Design a protein with these regions (language model features):
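An alpha-helical, amphipathic repeat domain used for nucleic-acid recognition
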Residues: 1-332
């Protein structure tokens, strides 16, 4: 009935609705025509509704001027003029909104002084002055924020102490002093972090004892002692790691027995015994590997003769018989 729809209109207008937003809300219960008629005759001042909507919105979440304007336009369907009137007249102190936004951000994510300013400017659409005011006045202990950020990072990935400091400085924008404090107070056992790094690495990529050890020191900031502890205690079967490495190599490039052995020892850091185990057990058909290598050469080099291709395959470590098989299959 009209009485029912008018009563519902009055209830909605207490919260602040735009014309289009109110029509949409009423259409869940009434027909479109009934909703339009009720809204056309409700006598609402849509500018004041925008003010009310802005005030109600600010009661449960902090917004910048531009952020609130966008919210009123895009999600509550006020016109440009109504949304502008709403934010201009809602009585908000945008500096204090920046403080509230900073506090809200810190409730669910740890961050640094400088990064929080950037987030308030970029995502919250506060002016830089408002963002700086908000961050300066939010009461955060930035050293403790660094500790929390370190602990959050450790939930998802293994880190060395130096790697953690670098992450906190480079990504989170903490000062070096704050990052050092966090690394010392986040509760990490760096030996166990090293072990975790090795274990996680070997889950998706085979590696040798020496390769892992050196990479941990050269690229990931672990000490020699931590790296040694990790590779000694990770439980890896290095023969099987060599075998996996050999099989992965053969998936993307053809190799001869001798070339594969050389790759495993000279480039991947496996021992001679581990490399020998791998090439003996990788299941490769060396004739077919020679054929694949020959086909690669034929694809990229024109006018190859039989003798030239034989020479190239033998240079790659294939036996005379394997090279002969390959060129015979190609009809040369």
């Amino acid at each position: 009935s009209m009485a029912d729809i008018n009563e519902m209109v009055e209830l909605y207008l207490e919260d602040g609705y735009s014309y289009d937003g109110l029509v949409e809300a009423l259409e869940y219960t009434f027909t479109h025509d009934e909703a339009v008629e009720a809204v056309d005759n409700c006598g609402a001042d849509w500018n004041e509704q925008a003010v009310l909507a802005a005030q109600n919105t600010l009661e449960y979440t902090a917004y910048s001027y531009d952020g609130l304007y966008y919210m009123l336009m895009e999600y509550q369907y006020f016109t440009d003029e109504q949304a502008r009137y709403g934010v201009d007249n809602c009585g908000a102190d945008w500096n204090e909104q920046a403080v509230a936004a900073a506090l809200q951000q810190l409730e669910f994510s740890s961050t640094s002084h400088d990064k929080l300013i950037e987030e308030l400017v970029e995502y919250g659409e506060f002016t830089r002055e408002q963002a700086e005011y908000g961050v300066e006045n939010c009461g955060a202990d930035w050293s403790e924020q660094a500790v929390k950020a370190a602990q959050e990072s450790l939930e998802y990935s293994a880190y060395s102490r130096d790697g953690m400091v670098e992450e906190l400085v480079e990504y989170y924008m903490f000062t070096d002093e704050q990052a050092q404090y966090a690394a010392d107070n986040c509760g990490a056992d760096w030996d166990e972090q090293a072990l975790r790094y090795v274990t996680e690495t070997l889950e998706y990529s085979p590696d040798s004892y020496d390769g892992l050890y050196q990479a941990m020191i050269d690229y990931y900031g672990y000490t020699a002692e931590q790296a040694q502890y990790a590779v000694d205690n990770c439980g890896a079967d290095w023969n099987e790691q060599a075998l996996k490495a050999a099989q992965e190599t053969l998936e993307y490039t053809p190799c001869s027995y001798s070339d594969l052995y050389t790759n495993l020892t000279e480039y991947d850091g496996f021992t001679e015994e581990q490399a020998q185990y791998a090439v003996d057990n990788c299941g490769a058909d060396w004739n077919e590997q020679a054929l694949l290598a020959a086909q690669d050469y034929m694809e990229y080099l024109d006018d190859l003769t039989r003798d030239t291709l034989l020479t190239m395959l033998e240079f790659d470590g294939f036996t005379d018989e394997q090279a002969e098989y390959a060129v015979d299959q190609l009809g040369l």
